[in-house]
Swiss-Prot record:
This is Aprataxin. The histidine triad, also called HIT motif, forms part of the binding loop for the alpha-phosphate of purine mononucleotide. The gene is aptx. InterPro entries: FHA_2 (IPR041388), Histidine_triad_CS (IPR019808), HIT-like (IPR011146), HIT-like_sf (IPR036265), SMAD_FHA_dom_sf (IPR008984), Znf-C2HE (IPR032566), Znf_C2H2_type (IPR013087). The record marks S188, H265, H276, K291 as: Interaction with DNA substrate. Coiled coil: none annotated. It catalyses: a 5'-end adenosine-5'-diphospho-5'-2'-deoxyribonucleoside-DNA + H2O = a 5'-end 5'-phospho-2'-deoxyribonucleoside-DNA + AMP + 2 H(+); a 5'-end adenosine-5'-diphospho-5'-ribonucleoside-2'-deoxyribonucleotide-DNA + H2O = a 5'-end 5'-phospho-ribonucleoside-2'-deoxyribonucleotide-DNA + AMP + 2 H(+); a 3'-end 2'-deoxyribonucleotide-3'-diphospho-5'-guanosine-DNA + H2O = a 3'-end 2'-deoxyribonucleotide 3'-phosphate-DNA + GMP + 2 H(+).
Length: 356
């Protein structure tokens, strides 16, 4: 059976083992390094279903825990799968889960060790199904006992390591998985073929799937997961990113290129903050659907200057509720606002504004 690991996207600590069917409680404290007082010491309860490849997430704290953009809700339980992100509280402190096949049988041994140390714990009450669409809870007569990360998980993991039961594959995963979420992006940042510009603070790369004739990403070398992770102390960095974006636009080799925009997606597709610098022709085979189009032509695309202003005045970035609904808006030309029923028709129309 696979082992399940909870991994801090921001790399704040080592991966945390989530034993099969054991309830693990996380929140503010040394295990997560979270110091935010809006995060309860018992903010979430996680229970891995290693044989099914998902983790049940129960919100215990008062402030919202969410999976991607979906709020779990206090007392409710939702499923989290690999590829999704768990935000412990208020869309902050992102985590992913990873399942790795256990070649040594260590899952069984670690589960038995945990059960033995906690066999006197009270049984949890049966869980109630949440009203949310993705929520699915399997109720059994006897729920697994809760365990503290500090004592049982760390003790169990230490026992596995000392007894030599941890497989080589999982051992390698432990060494490298803290940054697994952005390995592809990190590789692109370091790839001379992808780099267009770099300095000691940022690097500019070509977007792997450009949505226009010119589409670059400005990324800080510093690991920052998303807009919501930005704080006032990042203001100078974000200003520098915008300055580099303006430099890229000035140096564009195509003098006939239409105007550019530079900005951020409200909910980014990659877990490393990045500034899009994109020409407004949208002439690219990679622009294929309504989601692509609306992510750059509606308020889902937040102007770089607006982000700078929010940091200067508020010290943080606020994302409007229901931002994802903007991706479902009708297709409209961003120049004349004419509505279209499909992407091919819209692209054909764009030729009248931006001849090749």
């Amino acid at each position: 059976m696979p082992l399940c690991w909870l991994i801090s996207v921001e790399g704040n600590h080592k991966p945390i083992l989530l034993p099969h069917l054991q309830a693990v409680v996380l929140g503010r404290g040394p295990e997560t390094t979270i110091k935010d007082k809006k995060c309860s010491r018992e903010q979430v309860e996680l229970q891995a279903e290693c044989n099914k490849g998902y983790v049940k997430v129960k919100q215990l704290g008062l402030n919202p825990t969410s999976i991607d953009s979906l709020v779990v809700g206090k007392g409710s339980v939702s499923k989290m799968k690999p590829g999704q992100q768990l935000y412990i509280v208020n869309q902050l402190y992102p985590y992913t889960v990873q399942f790795k096949e256990d070649l040594s049988g260590s899952t069984k041994r670690s589960r038995e060790a945990v059960s033995e140390t906690r066999h006197n714990d009270k049984e949890e009450p049966c869980r109630k199904s949440s009203k949310q669409g993705e929520v699915s809870v399997s109720v059994s007569q006897k729920e697994a006992p809760k365990m503290s990360v500090r004592s049982n998980v760390h003790f169990s993991l230490l026992s596995i390591l000392l007894s030599g039961l941890l497989s080589e594959g999982v051992g390698k995963m432990l060494q490298g998985s803290v940054g697994h979420w952005n390995l592809g992006l990190k590789a692109s940042m370091q790839d001379p073929e992808m780099q267009v510009y770099k300095d000691d603070k940022v690097v500019v790369i070509k977007d792997k799937y450009p949505k226009a004739r010119y589409h670059w990403l400005v990324l800080p070398w510093q690991s920052i997961s998303s807009l919501k992770a930005l704080r006032k102390e990042h203001c100078d960095l974000v200003k520098h990113m915008q300055q580099v974006a303006e430099q890229m636009i000035r140096q564009c080799p195509d003098a006939s290129t239409p105007r550019f925009r530079s900005g951020y997606h409200a909910i980014p597709s990659m877990s490393h903050v990045h500034l899009h610098v994109i020409s407004q022709d949208f002439d690219s085979p990679c622009l294929k659907n309504k989601k692509h189009w609306n992510s750059f032509t509606t308020d889902y695309f937040i102007e770089s200057q607006a982000v700078i202003q929010m940091l200067e005045t508020d010290g943080s970035i606020s994302i409007k509720e229901g931002a994802t609904e903007l991706l479902k808006l009708p297709l409209r030309c961003h120049v004349c606002r004419k509505e279209f029923s499909n992407i091919p028709a819209l692209k054909q129309h764009l030729n009248s504004h931006f001849p090749s």
